[in-house]
Regions:
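Glycine-rich, highly charged phosphate/nucleotide-binding loops
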Residues: 50-69, 84
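Short acidic active-site motifs
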Residues: 63, 88, 113, 117, ...
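Glycosyltransferases and closely related glycan-assembly transferases
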Residues: 65-76, 85-101, 141-143
């Protein structure tokens, strides 16, 4: 197919966000045999004398209309697309009646997060893909737009560290990368983890008064750890996780997630991922595996293989295209 992928490519960031989902979906769709034209929503919005996205919203919408006129895609795939107006989608429907329109969304779809901009777009979408499962999908099922769960995408050229191959020279037993700014519950959890760690070597970035890390600096931190902790804003939302989960599992780290997340539907417990019921349970399991690095690496290896086989950008791209064009979930290697 010929696809216009309109998302926040953030080309002005000079590669600091090279690991974002936009690029993984783009590459995966190309690997699946499609032609993909990139349209960077935010960068087009900033293309004004003030460099302001707010002032440039209208311009970005005008540019998207022109882009679809020039490319004549079979599919317009939107990523988040906060700045794309429903009126723009209505016009695109009118001018390109044979073109399918779909949108993927990888942020939370529960309060207090701001995702209200999705609802006015639904009447003009053929499909909506979100990285949340269960009952939270029901709120979008009030129009003919079809809705489906997708996992966060991985890319073997990005998540390529293969950290399960060598457990020597590790500075940390368990590392956590994620912000605790204005996240009091997360901060309290991490503080209690430190108090109860009792010999566990813990590493932090972007939290616990440690600076954030990006790009190679983040990879360097991961290389120094045997295991990693995957936390989301809420850990009781069916199948939801930030894309941190594939950055950890895809690189071969033995990854810990809350059992309440439901990620057991994607990863086999104690074989591909370790699940904990409480902070005390996390500490017990992390301590045990820190003393059994071969077992930790075996879990990391199995998780890495599952991530790249089942949840690659290509696999998810294949599913999205089949779903939006044919309305079928038959190619889905994950539960719906």
């Amino acid at each position: 197919m010929r696809i216009v992928h309109a998302a926040h490519y953030s080309l002005t960031r000079d590669g600091t966000e090279f690991f974002n989902c936009e690029f993984k979906f783009h590459t995966g769709l190309c690997q699946a045999g499609h032609y993909v034209y990139p349209f960077s929503i935010n960068d087009r919005a900033r293309a004004n004398i003030f460099g302001s996205k707010t002032f440039g919203k209208g311009f970005s919408n005008t540019c998207l209309l022109a882009c679809c006129k020039n490319v004549e895609p079979d599919l317009l795939l939107l990523g988040h697309a906060q700045y794309i107006k429903p009126e723009t989608l209505r016009l695109l429907r009118q001018v390109h009646p044979r073109m399918k329109i779909a949108l993927w969304y990888v942020d939370p779809v529960y309060a207090p997060h701001d995702y209200g901009h999705l609802f006015p777009k639904l009447p003009y979408l053929d499909a909506l893909f979100v990285t949340t499962g269960g009952e939270h999908l029901d709120q979008f099922r009030k129009t003919p737009c079809r809705v489906a769960f997708i996992p966060n995408p991985a890319d073997s050229n990005l998540e390529r560290l293969n950290l399960d191959e060598d457990h020597s020279k590790k500075a940390y037993d368990l590392v956590y990368i994620g912000s605790d700014k204005n996240r009091h519950e997360r901060r309290s959890f991490l503080e209690e983890l430190i108090q109860k760690s009792d010999g566990l070597r813990l590493g932090f970035a972007a939290c616990m008064n440690q600076p954030p890390v990006w790009g190679e600096a983040k990879d360097h931190l991961l290389r120094k750890s045997l295991m990693a902790l995957n936390l989301s804003d809420r850990n009781d939302i069916a199948l939801y996780s930030s894309d941190r989960v594939v950055q950890l599992t895809g690189n071969g780290l033995c990854t810990f997630s809350a059992a309440s997340s439901g990620l057991q539907a994607l990863y086999e417990p104690d074989q591909e991922m370790v699940f904990f019921d409480s902070l005390d349970d996390l500490v017990v399991k992390a301590k045990r595996l820190s003393q059994r690095p071969d077992e930790a690496c075996a879990i990391g290896r199995a998780g890495r293989i599952k991530t790249h086989q089942r949840y690659s950008g290509k696999a998810i791209g294949d599913f999205m295209c089949t779903f939006v064009m044919n309305g079928t979930r038959s190619s889905s290697p994950w539960p719906q």
